[in-house]
């Protein structure tokens, strides 16, 4: 059994899995855990493991948001495979919590701004703010991830932003996605992602017999 109590970017866990060892990895940040999950899934397609300590439902997400808003932001950003903005730094983010890169024509890379709100009260002003950030940053789209359900005026304001025409179809420029939506498998509608957004781990040889680990 390999125990890595500070698994960070997952190098030790990756090596243990490649060698067919049982392992347990521990980290205090949801950002690190989500990146390790992605690394393992890329390197070992079909791998099975358990993740403990991350929200499994809306109530769990609300508890995380109440305990630590930054951990909630990093966790929520990982659910839409966005690149965390500013890494693990805490503080002013200019209205940007994550970035999603995509290729609207299959060649040129563009971006969507992700804004996360874990509070119980959300308002139309937050959608207007996201629209301003999208314009300021030269982004093509914006995604508003919220724990609380959006209000009618928020939905109306998002609709006013119009649509983004791409070679792969038409997409709403501003989209509101709730945590409940994400748990139901309903994420933002976007053009094909840019595979270079995250550095992908190379696939490993699956010929070795492996045992089911825990994370």
Residue ranges and their predicted role:
Residues 6-10:
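Class I SAM-dependent methyltransferase "Motif I" SAM/SAH-binding loop
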Residues 14, 24-215:
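Mixed-charge (Asp/Glu-Lys/Arg
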Residues 1-5:
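Conserved class I S-adenosyl-L-methionine
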Residues 11-21:
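Conserved SAM-binding loop of SAM-dependent methyltransferases across substrates and taxa
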